[in-house]
Amino acid sequence: MSTKYIFVTGGVVSSIGKGIVAASLGRLLKNRGLKVTIQKFDPYINIDPGTMSPYQHGEVFVTDDGAETDLDLGHYERFIDINLNKYSNVTTGKIYSEVLRKERRGEYLGATVQVIPHITDALKEKIKRAALTTDSDVIITEVGGTVGDIESLPFLEALRQMKADVGADNVMYIHTTLLPYLKAAGEMKTKPTQHSVKELRGLGIQPNMLVIRTEEPAGQGIKNKLAQFCDVAPEAVIESLDVEHLYQIPLNLQAQGMDQIVCDHLKLDAPAADMTEWSAMVDKVMNLKKQVKISLVGKYVELQDAYISVVEALKHSGYVNDAEVKINWVNANDVTAENVAELLSDADGIIVPGGFGQRGTEGKIQAIRYARENDVPMLGVCLGMQLTCIEFARHVLGLEGANSAELAPETKYPIIDIMRDQIDIEDMGGTLRLGLYPSKLKRGSKAAAAYHNQEVVQRRHRHRYEFNNAFREQFEAAGFVFSGVSPDNRLVEIVEIPENKFFVACQYHPELSSRPNRPEELYTAFVTAAVENSN
């Protein structure tokens, strides 16, 4: 069977939910027995989002093979339950960088290097490579931004060319748009969608399906009008209504026959999607009996997308505890020794997630100290683990001024120091310790118990600094347990204080591996402890 290509574009406004639509379709096709992969095209000039501010971009999602990618890849992985790779996120910067390197090496044999064909060919190669490396039946490609953005033009041209390259039966174009509802007039407006489709057709792409994002049901009359003016079948105008829970969306799209229309267009002979388990999960999510309060102490809390995988992992772990996770967003910059008890007193559990830079670190340290001294279940992640070690050094070991060499290079007690293989690296982008690495677990520890007594667990990392082993014996003598280390025993991966209900911190990012139907184990152990603490 030829590989099938589905392209998802957006119009009218950005952040309309293209990624969720693409991920939901991926889940439906996977449940039809098809092998699916998915990728995101981002038209910005950055090579990747690794050096972008979380306020600009939100979370950086890391793949198994160490690619720093768009947060939509997190949605893709959680919905479809697949592990993506470096070909799943492509940016303008990455494409131009590769094309220019080829030009410098003389690979274009003296030709004038142009957007067409060189940039568009490179984009098409990325699409095909993503399908080839995963041996997929179907690849879904989402293009970031909206039709009409100048940055998107080479991407859309590449998508247009794909139809001629692989055949019309192997390509489908899905266009997502906003259908605004004017309360004063009491009507929906189709004109923005019509203009968006007109713009897309002007670029040579005729959409085969429209997905309309709307707050209110559109009604068949609106669908027929859009079908007529946009030249799509009435049944191929699909509603994406606002929902209480994201995981309802695949079921809503299936109820409208979206996946069947896609299969018919692409001539895919696949059985109906069995969504029984997914539906049961959604029913459970909608009817959770308990509630648990988790305080998230972070420096980017003004933009909650900066912690989207953390939030989803907490929710997933709540599901298996029959508990709705209520998150109290605590700005680390506001936390002091004087107000920490007031800010965190009602927390059933405290999580201190990752981050970079000095701002907010002292507030996080105060939150960690509060959790340790008051025996509140606490999970530290990445920088959260490093600050857990610093807090212990200062307030238990008495090492006044203990810090990280990253945050205070002049510190007398560099509890956290730069990794040896990072010392001579000057570039910031793409140079961290990235991707999947193993951690050897200490038998009898809370970490080992969380992972069902596995000897080794593999999780994704994103860091440049590590625990300074010169202090390891001093920590252990005071009851601090290093419950996870690299197989060569050189890098500290997990730390804990066994006397507390749950006081565990890890260098890696467990949230990146969590799924709604398969929550990450360390997060589950943490949320379980928080639920028990709430009783």
UniProtKB/Swiss-Prot annotation:
InterPro entries: Class_I_gatase-like (IPR029062), CTP_synthase (IPR004468), CTP_synthase_N (IPR017456), GATASE (IPR017926), GATase1_CTP_Synthase (IPR033828), P-loop_NTPase (IPR027417). Allosterically activated by GTP, when glutamine is the substrate; GTP has no effect on the reaction when ammonia is the substrate. The allosteric effector GTP functions by stabilizing the protein conformation that binds the tetrahedral intermediate(s) formed during glutamine hydrolysis. Inhibited by the product CTP, via allosteric rather than competitive inhibition. Pfam families: CTP_synth_N (PF06418), GATase (PF00117). Its EC number is 6.3.4.2. The keyword Nucleotide-binding applies. The keyword Chloroplast does not apply. CTP binds at S14, D149, I150, E151, K189, T190, K191, P192, T193, Q194, K225. One of its GO terms (cellular component) is cytosol. SUPFAM superfamilies: Class I glutamine amidotransferase-like, P-loop containing nucleoside triphosphate hydrolases. L-glutamine binds at Y55, G355, L383, G384, M385, Q386, E406, R464. Residues 293-535 form the Glutamine amidotransferase type-1 domain. CTPSs have evolved a hybrid strategy for distinguishing between UTP and CTP. The overlapping regions of the product feedback inhibitory and substrate sites recognize a common feature in both compounds, the triphosphate moiety. To differentiate isosteric substrate and product pyrimidine rings, an additional pocket far from the expected kinase/ligase catalytic site, specifically recognizes the cytosine and ribose portions of the product inhibitor. Catalyzes the ATP-dependent amination of UTP to CTP with either L-glutamine or ammonia as the source of nitrogen. Regulates intracellular CTP levels through interactions with the four ribonucleotide triphosphates. This is CTP synthase.
